[in-house]
């Protein structure tokens, strides 16, 4: 489901593109913002109104390459953060949380630090083939990865690697139950009686990969590429302006369009300014 809001936020830009006052702005409904700028109406994002897209079902995991000299430090950090080592070989480590995803972070061992891209799970083998053709890239079998599957890696217009996976088997059930939900008292309802809220110190409870962000140069180019080729649509768009008639889109929160199925507010964040 889609929640369309556009947020205006002004910034100082030192690149020479535009110069606006910092620390001012407002949040307005998308349809209000669209009256004065060249945005298409919300119906433009309905999956049925566009040509067939590569159908993404969820965000799967992140992929990075790390030098061997830094692997022990990385492992210590991720274990302290709340992940666990699912599998380790001479060339890679797979780190996971407690959810049904086999792993959420892939660390390949190489000569240098390198971003290998976020990974999206696609709906069908045909979608994987279409992604492969889009990037003219091969489909490889993940023989060593927990859960297996097949993957292809393409690159977006700014050169970021983008991975697509199909056929990976999830865990049959989470490794443990989620944390007990906090009971909150309000003015009229007092479900928590005679009990304190106490938190146990320790690592975070890592469930899944929720989202990742990219800091980019050409927002319009990247935005069109991701929304034209895949079922990614904006939940929120942020823009800056130096006068009422000149507005520049600078960031977007994108979610996966699954029709009437409710999904997370965003799984990808792209900005041409400071990355969150």
Q: Where are each of the predicted segments found?
A:
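Vicinal oxygen chelate
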Residues: 2-51, 65-72, 136-205, 252-253, ...
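Conserved beta-strand positions that form and line the central face of beta-propeller blades
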Residues: 94, 106, 153, 253, ...
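Core segments of cupin and vicinal oxygen chelate
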Residues: 2, 13-25, 57-102, 214-263
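Amide-forming acyltransferase catalytic core, primarily the GNAT-like/NAT-type
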Residues: 146, 160, 165-273
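The feature marks the first
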Residues: 36-37, 42-141, 148
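Structured loop/turn residues at beta-strand edges in well-structured enzyme cores
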Residues: 57, 113, 157, 207, ...
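Short, well-ordered strand-loop elements centered on a beta-strand within folded domains, enriched
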Residues: 113-117, 267, 271-276
